[in-house]
Amino acid sequence: DWRTSVINECLELEKNTGIKGNWVKLTDMWRQNYMPSMDKVRNGEREWVNLDTLHKESLIKILKELNINGLSEKNLNHLNTAWHRLSPWSDTVEGLNLLKSNYSISTLSNGGIDLLTNMANKQKLPWDNVFSAETFMHYKPDSETYLGAVEKLNCETHEVMLVAAHNNDLLSAKSYGLKTAFVLRATEYGENQDFDLKAENEIDVSA
């Protein structure tokens, strides 16, 4: 639950430093910069950098735009790693453990290996493997990320299922031959979310 988690991290920062800001707007703007920042890597405008670097660049820009000043470098770096400390949805850990009883379960995220490992350790997420865009030096939806995970698992594409809350991610995986499952997160982007409220018809399973 990235949105609630990051907003809470911002509020904790305000409590500790006295620096005030529109933290809901900052969080939403930060997420809005997510895909555009990765696209510059994907289209060759810049060399590979991991998501922590992209997140920090976006954060610095947004802080200036919102006129939020006075953060020390230490506070800035701590806020930037809020993405390492996200809290899971209430059904996540139980659901992963149920899946793990019958299947091998892995991440396939644009987050870095360090980010995913920190999150797993903090929240007791029982991954068998941690696959990241950093593993393949490609951000989703590049084919190298999806197919790279399939290769690492020593599987055929039809033997691997991507489970996600985002139709665009699932449709990309589907286009490369993976099975797909949609999990609804109706408030991921806030109470007024108006997309990713149901699976597209092409998705194999809707949970």
Which residues are covered by each model-predicted region?
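A generic structural motif
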Residues: 19, 102-104, 178
